[in-house]
């Protein structure tokens, strides 16, 4: 049977492959588009470091009769705002709107981490707090952010909707794994818990990025447009 360490190494390798691919794809990006690639590199790069750390056995924190993998939550606290930031760039959010969605996202992650670290029944109250914040985040992703994205080109809007759907659907699975796994009622073994999380992390980070790269290539080839929504043949404009 595959052990936890092996699963963590698989996650690290997958994230590293994604990081290298995103860095290579963005090597010639114009100034307006560069931040999209930097964000993708940050998402998978941070996750790669977290998985290496866990594979080395660092950050395995005993809580009651379970083990909390602290780097997992630190990874999420750092990378999920970057995913939301990327979506916000596509949607064309202003600074106030960015602040709202990133704050909601951070509350979700902090509540999940705190709940995992609490041995008693109070952890479910923290889980509930995170769930409420998650519903608020979904509302913004599906409502105001989608409306904002509709003001952009059809290609950018289509990419936003694809990435939004991927994010919302797969992120909605994480709370159930938390509840059914070691932090909750422990119906899932640690190995199953880790395997599911590794798979979801790879899809929501590396898969997310590859969808963005594919769409960027299509926009460039068919419309002469970049992720930043400008003509790729036009002079680059500083951010």
Curated annotation (Swiss-Prot):
PROSITE patterns noted in UniProt: BACTERIAL_OPSIN_1 (PS00950), BACTERIAL_OPSIN_RET (PS00327)
Extracellular-side segments: 1-3, 56-69, 118-121, 182-189
Ranges per topology, Cytoplasmic: 26-33, 92-94, 150-153, 223-239
CDD domains referenced in this protein's UniProt entry, alphabetically: 7tm_SRI_SRII
Pfam families: Bac_rhodopsin
Top-level taxon of the source organism: Archaea
N6-(retinylidene)lysine modifications at: 205
Protein keywords: Cell membrane, Chromophore, Membrane, Photoreceptor protein, Receptor, Retinal protein, Sensory transduction, Transmembrane, Transmembrane helix
CC terms in the record's Gene Ontology section: plasma membrane
Cellular compartment(s): Cell membrane
InterPro entries: Arc/bac/fun_rhodopsins (IPR001425), Rhodopsin_retinal_BS (IPR018229)
Transmembrane portions of the chain: 4-25, 34-55, 70-91, 95-117, 122-149, 154-181, 190-222
Assembly and oligomerization: Homodimer. Interacts with HTR-II.
PANTHER family, per database record: BACTERIORHODOPSIN _OPSIN, NOPA (EUROFUNG) (PTHR28286:SF2), PTHR28286
Protein name listed in UniProt: Sensory rhodopsin-2
Organism: Natronomonas pharaonis (Natronobacterium pharaonis)
């Amino acid at each position: 049977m595959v052990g936890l360490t092996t699963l963590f190494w698989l996650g690290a390798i997958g994230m590293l492959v994604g990081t290298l691919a995103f860095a290579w794809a963005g090597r010639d990006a114009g100034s307006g588009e560069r931040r999209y690639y930097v964000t993708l590199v940050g998402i998978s790069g941070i996750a790669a470091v977290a998985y290496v750390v866990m594979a080395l056995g660092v950050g395995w924190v005993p809580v009651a009769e379970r083990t909390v993998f602290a780097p997992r939550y630190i990874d999420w606290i750092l990378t999920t705002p970057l995913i939301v930031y990327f979506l916000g760039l596509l949607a064309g959010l202003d600074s106030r709107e960015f602040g709202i969605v990133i704050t909601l996202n951070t509350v979700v992650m902090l509540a999940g981490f705190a709940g995992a670290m609490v041995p008693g029944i109070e952890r479910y109250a923290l889980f509930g707090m995170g769930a409420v914040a998650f519903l608020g985040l979904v509302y913004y992703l599906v409502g105001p952010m989608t409306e904002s994205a509709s003001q952009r080109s059809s290609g950018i809007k289509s990419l936003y909707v694809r990435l939004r759907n991927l994010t919302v659907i797969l992120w909605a699975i994480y709370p159930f794994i938390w509840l059914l796994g070691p932090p909750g009622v422990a119906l899932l073994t640690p190995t199953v818990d880790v395997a599911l999380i590794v798979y979801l992390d790879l899809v929501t980070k590396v898969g997310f990025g590859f969808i963005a790269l594919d769409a960027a290539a299509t926009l460039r080839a068919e419309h002469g447009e970049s992720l930043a929504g400008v003509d790729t043949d036009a002079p680059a404009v500083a951010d």
